[in-house]
Structures are given as C-alpha cells and as structure tokens.
Amino acid sequence: MHANWKTWAHVTKLDPDKRLPPGAAEEIATSGTDALMLSGTLNVTQENLNELLDQVSPYGLPLVVEPASPDCAIFDGRIDHLFVPSVVNANDVRWIVGKHYTWLRHANSIDWDMVVPEAYIVLNPNSAVGRVTGADCALSCRDVAAFVEVADRYFRFPIVYIEYSGRYGDPSIVQAASDAVEHAVLYYGGGIRSAEQAAEMGRIADTIVVGNAVYDEGIDVLRATVRAVQ
C-alpha cells in the first residue's frame, strides 16, 4: 500500500548531493514531517541517491523520489512514490515532455501505481532549476493562475507545485495559484526558514516543502515549521 500523499501538510526535501551529518537522518525522520522527498537539480546520481535512501529508509517515513533525469527515475522497494516533474513554464521542451519521452522510450517497465506527475511552476530565475530549465519566471498573478488552470483542468496534473527554490515566495502569487486550482493538490516550496513563513504558506497551499533550512538552519527550525502546519 502506497502512502496517501494527498493528505500531507509538510514534506521535507533532501538533496542527494548534500551530506547529512551523523544522526541527522533520524532527527529529520522523527521531526513530525509527513514525508521525505529525495530531490535535487544538479549532480544527482544513482549512487548518491541510493546512499541517501540507505540513510533514511530505516525509519518508516513515506519516501518520495523526485528525479531530475531519467537515470534517477527508479522503482525501489524502499520508496512509496516517484513524483515526476514537468516544468510547465520552461522555455525548453525537454523539461516539459522531452525527458519523460526519453525515460519511457528506454524503460524496461514502469510501475504506474507509484508515479505521480507534477506540474512545476518555477519562479526563481537565479535558482539552479530556473537556470537549467530556462523557466520564464517573470510571471504575474494572472500568468501563474493561467498556468495553474492549464496544468489542473486541461492536463489534469494531480500536483501543481509553486517552486521558488531557495527564495521565499510572494504570497499573493501563491494565493493566485490557490484560487485557480480546482482538482490538484497545491504544493509550495522555497525559502521557508521559520515557523512564521511555514504558517503563512501553509494557510494558502495544501502542502509545504522545506528543504534548504534542513541544512542551513538545523533540526530545531525544521521542527518549528512542522508544528506551524500540523
């Protein structure tokens, strides 16, 4: 039985390219977060992804892999879901559908019960994901709402993900996305480093994702962001 990702309020994102200090995996897994997402834009390999899985899988928390390339789209008995992103505001079609085609063209088999497609709207042009995908980040509230409607109502993505990637976002933009979404679960990620920021975005989005704070601020801040939304 796969974990019910639709009910999660707080997800912690861990980057396989970043090292966790000794004991950190257990502290993160027992912080109260609903799930762990293993995800990164640069320098993610099967080797460092599996190393991180080895660290976090013993604690029984739901695990998601979010692959940045077909090589890391793995089906592993330790993970619950594969969240596969399409950057819908990318200027390079490879990040919308091209890499997905490559993955399916060469895959031996796909466990579709594990796959959850995500419509990413990337809004930080200075982030790695913004640069790599060539995302058009200069979007108004109406622009974002239109992308949400395309993703949610036309393409029927089950997740719409507002991604500021390392920078705290504009609540009015996230509110516009929330107002536009009808069916999908709305995720927000980017720059959450305090309980106050977690609470603010948690009131708008269905699920908040906390990532860099784990490495930069430490476990106490992570726990505070969990308490703010649960």
Protein language model regions, located:
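Conserved N-terminal beta1-alpha1 strand-loop-helix module at the mouth
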Residues: 1-63, 136-156
